[in-house]
From Swiss-Prot:
Organism: Coxiella burnetii (strain RSA 493 / Nine Mile phase I)
GO (cellular component) term, any one: cytosol
Task of the protein: IF-3 binds to the 30S ribosomal subunit and shifts the equilibrium between 70S ribosomes and their 50S and 30S subunits in favor of the free subunits, thus enhancing the availability of 30S subunits on which protein synthesis initiation begins.
Transcription regulation among keywords: no
GO function terms (MF aspect): ribosome binding; translation initiation factor activity
Highest taxon above the source species: Bacteria
PANTHER family, per the entry: TRANSLATION INITIATION FACTOR IF-3, TRANSLATION INITIATION FACTOR IF-3, MITOCHONDRIAL
Summary of subunit composition and partner proteins: Monomer.
Encoding gene per record: infC
Pfam families, alphabetized: IF3_C, IF3_N
Example GO BP: ribosome disassembly
Protein name: Translation initiation factor IF-3
Length: 185
């Protein structure tokens, strides 16, 4: 497998290259040794920009500066990426008020971090006859959180009812204090 390293100066071993000078203007197809001489006269490097082109495209530039700009560009792209995790918070139909508040705050924390949250509700035994309690609880979670988008509506999977939520984009972001103050009410 060929390495992706950029070839510079004497590493370029093709007879002819399409040359772009330091001002960004096309010089045309020239012999590689002539292009190297022009780069040395300018006090810069001959850098192979597009090795797959016929003939390869080379540019006269400061290679150190080029590498620095490439690394900055990669860092900026990496910074823009955000890995979204799916967190799960489990409830029961008989979840008491105190536990409900704690779990709701945990969901709010996950959403503030930008994660998606799977809210699951587990039914045991005869609780399956009262699925409406589960829908009511998930509806209450949705209401209490306020600034969210339901990605997956509540649905029953065996003995478990699940709903996936995420933070709404573009709406007024509240501070954590305001969120928690609303949850306590």
């Amino acid at each position: 497998m060929r390495s992706k390293r950029t070839r510079v100066n004497n590493q370029i071993r093709v007879p002819e290259v399409r040359l772009i000078d330091e001002k960004g203007e096309q010089v045309g197809v020239v012999r590689t040794d002539r292009a190297l001489t022009m780069a040395e006269e300018a006090g810069l490097d001959l850098v192979e920009i597009s090795p797959t082109a016929k003939p390869p495209v080379c540019r006269i530039m400061n290679f150190g500066k080029y590498q620095f700009e490439q690394s900055k560009r990669k860092a900026a792209q990496k910074k823009k990426q955000r890995l979204v995790h799916l967190k799960e918070v489990k409830f029961r139909p008989g979840t008491d008020v105190g536990d409900y508040q704690v779990k709701l705050r945990k969901i709010a924390t996950f959403l503030d971090r930008g994660d998606k949250v799977k809210v699951s509700l587990r039914f045991r035994g005869r609780e399956m006859q009262h699925r409406e309690l589960g829908l009511e609880l998930l509806g209450r979670v949705k209401r209490d959180l306020g600034n969210i988008v339901v990605e997956q509506e509540p649905r029953l999977e065996g003995r478990q009812m699940t709903m996936v939520v995420m933070k709404a984009k573009g709406e007024g972001n509240k501070t954590k204090r305001e969120d928690h103050a609303e949850i306590k009410d």
